[in-house]
Amino acid sequence: MEKSFCSPLDITQIEQNFSEINPALTEAEALYEANRCLYCYDAPCTRACPTHIDVPSFIKKIASGNLQGSARVIFDANPIGATCARVCPVDVLCEGACVEKTLLQKPIEIGRLQRYATDHAMEGGKQLFTKGEPNGKSVGIVGSGPAGLACAMYLARLGYDVTVYERRALPGGLDTYGMAEYKMSQSVSQAEVEQVAQLGVRFLLNTKVVAAAPDDEVLGEINRVSFDLLQEWHDAVFLAVGLGETNKLNIPGEEMDGVVDALHFIEKVKTRDWKSVPLGKSVAVIGAGNTAIDAVTQAKRLGAERVTMVYRRSEKDIPAYDYEYELAKKDGVEFVWQAAPVGILAGENGSALSLRCEKTDGSLQLLDISCDMIIKAVGQQKMRSFFEKVAGVETDEKGRVVVNENMQTSKPGIFAGGDCVNGGAEAVDASQMGKLAAQGIHIALTGEDIRFAGDRQAKI
């Protein structure tokens, strides 16, 4: 970004702006909240959780002072339970289904109680599970996000030799690189990774899986390994590669300096090297999903003078969750509705000067929004090329990998899950798909049907 600025705020102010928006419960608060729970039989909160955490059980253990037991219940059903305690949309999942809410009372703060228990386990470095007796079988997992981590944990507990291939320097996927810093720091996802690593799972970082490459070819700091070799080395392969780069706008000026994508911006913020994050004085963010909200709020908290979110539909159509939208409004973000970007105009130095939009309210009026930085948050591309050319598996018309009920792809021995299958959902959904894939892999390799925590027939 040629015309680059950095945050005008001092480090102390920035640190304060990026402190977690939902602080941890104190012991007294946790005990009070846990004792409000009715411990429902066939609890609707458990049914509303995609990983089916036994919510009454873990809350009851908090009430009795058994925090390690509580954390075990959580991580048994969801290996990224600490992450989900912070980033899950609990108001539309577990807390949204709480019986107290149906009685017109305040729902139990399930998310914060979940954080209380999982923080206790991770801060104490407690290992909650043990590696299973080696069974002589090996599984390779491509990607270390929620789906990959979940699959790895369950397979390791069953005795599989598990290797995770991750193209980045740190494992954790979007939990590490893509969550707004005020929601969750990288230390949380790394603590969950450590839980999995302690089960004997190997993480090969800076390693990219490609169509064809010599064994362990090194290009710069990145190792390249061919997918064919993965199939030779392992009895099964699980693809948990998520989604690709941000979609293109396909408008004039998109390649100018000062135009960045939201994921790269958020990733830069995650380094916490605050003064190195390129930041315009006036920032326009295109899109209105949860990633767009993360971008506008973080730009504002870094000290941008003006931040505007631009969306082609009306306010009532905003795809972001209500609480995310309210946060952006509270932070002083401005909104332009029913405006579709049609071009980016340059200043004298060739960098972005304004975003030209066409009104979608029927007037076709042109609107220029002055800005010196534009952030694209318009969804991510599907990795169709990777799946068809590298892995050789079938994708649907939207570029999503086609799987059966056991998460197996069209190619025997190859499984897939997470955003690359569902097109992009919550971290908790990806975790559940990783769990289902581990079950499917075990069934395929041993013929033994097995169900993990969160299933009425759970066996481990």
Language-model regions: role of each:
Residues D161-V164, R168-F203, V296-G343, E448-I460:
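Rossmann-like dinucleotide-binding cores of NAD(P)H-dependent redox enzymes
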Residues E133-A147, L279-I286:
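Beta1/beta-strand and adjacent pyrophosphate-binding region of the FAD-binding site
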Residues S138-T163, A292-K300:
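N-terminal Rossmann-like FAD-binding beta1-loop-alpha1 element of flavoenzymes
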Residues P79, G145-A147, G289-T291, V421:
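Residue-level detector of alpha-helix initiation sites
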